[in-house]
Amino acid sequence: MIYLFLSCFILFIGVSVWERRTIWLGILFCLMLASAFASLLPFIQYPSLWFYLIFLPIILLLSVGPLGFALLCLYKSFQLLYKEGRRWSNFLSFALGLGGLLIIFSYSHTETADYIQHRSWLLAVYTAFMLLVFYFTVQLIFFTTASVLNFTFTFVKKADYVLVLGAGLLGDRVTPLLASRIDKGISVYQKNPGSKLIMSGGQGSDESVSEAEAMRNYALKQGVPSQDIIVEKQSRNTRENMRFSKTLIKDGAPVAIVTSYYHLFRALTLARQEKLKSFGYGAKTRFYFTLNAFIREFIGYLMQTKKWQLLTFLILACCYCIFRYLFN
């Protein structure tokens, strides 16, 4: 296991330096932690101080964590629905929390488990469903880890351009969410003398001006010189933010992408696909909103990589079926 840990550690450092805008950053970090944990197992005896410091918290996290996370999702979903309205997109954290509770109930409720075990067709459906749940849970862990690493351990780099991504308007004014992105973008711009601010965002059907124009007006009020602001007002989604902004950027110039924390990793993966030399900064948002929005971003990432996700799941499902056939 120590060799697996060293291999994962070396690969993790390599990915961190060479190309961190990938899910492999999260995969390697998780494998590194798991292999380090496994390497320590033979050396820690129960009871001992190291057992209580290392293993007991992990055991508690694995046993209580799923229930706590499900309840947290439900609590934050009620906050979101109360403060932001009952739109379908605001029910994602509620659905995740409720689904988590139902799965925990099916595992812990003896009569339900026995009912499923004695009906072969139901057991097959339940097994397939749980394989999907396990797969997407692991993917969510990798996605979350890669996201956190991309906005918490950003190497300080020189940016020639600071690209701020739009996020909807209130009439012709920026929302608090969008204002936080612009404020963060201005902060990054001020730390990079000679850089240009790119405001990227199109005009929705219910908006009187484009997001980019409203963002520009906000930045001007904050004291940013007009000659340092570039407007890109054709984009309708994150991929178009990258694609259309690229035409305004000198080839090979380093770009700092600024968006909300929950949106940053997927934005960086799209920037990589559009061959932008980029790194990212996250703007703060309220946690009740971030949790639901992060789930939406995860779904967006799954759709963005759907071919690879389907292929990977089918391979793992086949491996599981072969294993069950050989050892059952």
Per-segment meaning from a language model:
Residues 118, 122-123, 138, 144, ...:
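A structural signal for short, hydrophobic/glycine-enriched beta-strand patches
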